[in-house]
């Protein structure tokens, strides 16, 4: 292509050179043939000139296209050189994307499994919560019913607290009794050792033993009388309360039989007289009598709760000031009340034992110079009494 372009340029240059040469005039009179040949040459020259211009334009266009193609070829070569590195990067990116997709699928499956487990556990917990709520409602209803029952039947005194205090006293006395037994066993062991080592110290040990036993017996006897007094007082208080409750629970038909004022007076006259002393208590019930000496109003109506409470308080206040007795510290026998040896209150009957005697048991064997001992309560007797009290409670 360059050679052709150069030829064209040479032709043009040659044409220019010919133009510069002086034109020799042609004679007009040479003939028709010379004119025709000259015209043919001119037309041929113009045609060749036109073709040369077209070829120059085409050559310039082709040169531009060649340059564009060369640039594209150079770019393609550069792309081919960098394509190996790009492919490796693309492969790495693809593998990474694939791994990320696999991890995403695994995490999605784990999430679905966890959601399923959570839904099942939530369902189980909801069932347990519903069951607990049902149990709580049942307990609330039971507590409310118990509160309603307690409000309808309020206690007239604090006999439950007194009973609990008596139980605590009994437990303390049992512990003291165990300590005294242990002390007695230790004293017996010491006495035997002293007898084996030195017979002359027998009298002194006997005297000391008797003194200790006398002190311990006095303590046990005083504790016994104190416990008996508390138990008798508690027994009579419960008996009075039971009597008042029986009067309160009489049917409504019997309530209409007597006038309210008369029945209240009869209830005041028929109230329990509670006699409390230091160690014993007596319970006496006096039925109201008519002027002819006959009892009136056999069917006692049930008073109101407030009236019953007032009457019980009056009976309790009157009972604390009557029939006091002295404390038998010397260990002599005392006269038991008839209410202790018989059953009362159907299921709540209490039986108190008779006081211990000196002839029942002794604390130790005396071989030489026996001294007179005071009346001591036997240990097994007190244990049996405590067990009976616990069983009856």
Swiss-Prot record:
Modified-residue entries (Phosphoserine), positions: 319, 354
PTMs per UniProt: Ubiquitinated via 'Lys-48'-linked polyubiquitination by TRIM38, leading to its degradation.
Short name of any one Pfam family annotated for the protein: TBD
Coiled-coil positions: 40-198
Transmembrane segments: none
Biased composition (Polar residues): 384-393
Region (Disordered) location: 321-340, 345-393
Spans annotated as Interaction with TBK1 and IKBKE: 217-258
Region of interest (Homodimerization), residue spans: 1-198
Location(s) in or outside the cell: Cytoplasm
Keywords: Coiled coil, Cytoplasm, Phosphoprotein, Ubl conjugation
GO biological process, one term: dendritic cell differentiation
Cellular-component GO terms for this entry: cytoplasm
Subunit description: Homodimer. Interacts with IKBKE, TBK1 and TICAM1. Interacts with TAX1BP1. Interacts with CALCOCO2.
General function of this protein: Adapter protein which binds TBK1 and IKBKE playing a role in antiviral innate immunity. Activates serine/threonine-protein kinase TBK1 and facilitates its oligomerization. Enhances the phosphorylation of NF-kappa-B p65 subunit RELA by TBK1. Promotes TBK1-induced as well as TNF-alpha or PMA-induced activation of NF-kappa-B. Participates in IFNB promoter activation via TICAM1.
Descriptive protein name: 5-azacytidine-induced protein 2
Gene name as annotated: AZI2
